[in-house]
Amino acid sequence: MRPSKRAADEMRAVSFERGVMRHAEGSCLVKFGDTHVLVSATLEERLPPWLKGQGRGWVTAEYSMLPRATHDRTRRESTTGKQSGRTQEIQRLIGRSLRSVTDLVALGEKQITLDCDVLQADGGTRTAAITGAWIALYDCLSWMRQRSMVKEIPLKDHVAAVSCGIYNGTPVLDLDYAEDSVAETDANFVMTGTGGIVEIQGTAEKTPFSQDELLGLLSLARSGVEKLVGLQKLAVG
């Protein structure tokens, strides 16, 4: 039995609230159960120096967590003078995931930055951030199209992410913190709406997992991403 009493293939309640930030070109408050992430999309005319003159744009991301997003207060990274390795890893993952479904040539020589701020953490913050960031990116690109900055929304597909793991010997979908903190195996899957795999991050916390177990988790993740993409489609109409 899972602590949340969910079925093994049951996700937490997922919701998207669009347009929650007045000044951002796109924004979304995404909730995976008690994990809440606020994502804002900012359009900028500047590009990284190494991209200038190449006729294409860039999509990048930043990730942070409010001090009391967690059970015990987490010190702000700005007070330490540097980002943790975890933060850098997550924001690079978010950026890679969004770029995988964005037509950067059609975007033109512009940069869109997705700021992902965790308001409350209960496991799966990176997967929620990726899934909500797609909504914020879509709204930013829609804003651009309305102003004739792009002819069409330069998105090639949806992208969403979900965690899977082995908890008490059972493969389960969308781990919350109570499961994630003691799971034998924990993995994150980033996939497109058409089923393409963008990234898999998997770790055996106790004993190594088998190829069959990995394929089982992949199947579970695919069903979860299909549900998330369906909710994204409903959210953007």
Curated annotation (Swiss-Prot):
Q: Which GO terms describe its molecular function?
A: 3'-5'-RNA exonuclease activity; tRNA binding; tRNA nucleotidyltransferase activity
Record keywords, A-Z? Nucleotidyltransferase, RNA-binding, rRNA processing, Transferase, tRNA processing, tRNA-binding
- State the CDD domains in the record: RNase_PH_bact
Pfam families recorded: RNase_PH (PF01138), RNase_PH_C (PF03725)
Reaction(s) catalysed by this chain, per the record, are: tRNA(n+1) + phosphate = tRNA(n) + a ribonucleoside 5'-diphosphate
The record's listing under InterPro entries reads: ExoRNase_PH_dom1, ExoRNase_PH_dom2, ExoRNase_PH_dom2_sf, PNPase/RNase_PH_dom_sf, Ribosomal_Su5_D2-typ_SF, RNase_PH, RNase_PH_bac-type, RNase_PH_CS
PROSITE patterns for this protein:
RIBONUCLEASE_PH
The entry marks the following residues as binding phosphate, namely R86, G124, T125, R126
Enzyme Commission (EC) number: 2.7.7.56
One GO term (biological process):
tRNA processing
The organism sits in which domain of life?
Bacteria
Q: Which family does it belong to?
A: Belongs to the RNase PH family.
Subunit details: Homohexameric ring arranged as a trimer of dimers.
What job does the chain carry out?
Answer: Phosphorolytic 3'-5' exoribonuclease that plays an important role in tRNA 3'-end maturation. Removes nucleotide residues following the 3'-CCA terminus of tRNAs; can also add nucleotides to the ends of RNA molecules by using nucleoside diphosphates as substrates, but this may not be physiologically important. Probably plays a role in initiation of 16S rRNA degradation (leading to ribosome degradation) during starvation.
The record's listing under NCBIfam families reads: RNasePH
UniProt protein name: Ribonuclease PH
Q: What is the lineage of its organism?
A: Bacteria, Pseudomonadati, Pseudomonadota, Alphaproteobacteria, Hyphomicrobiales
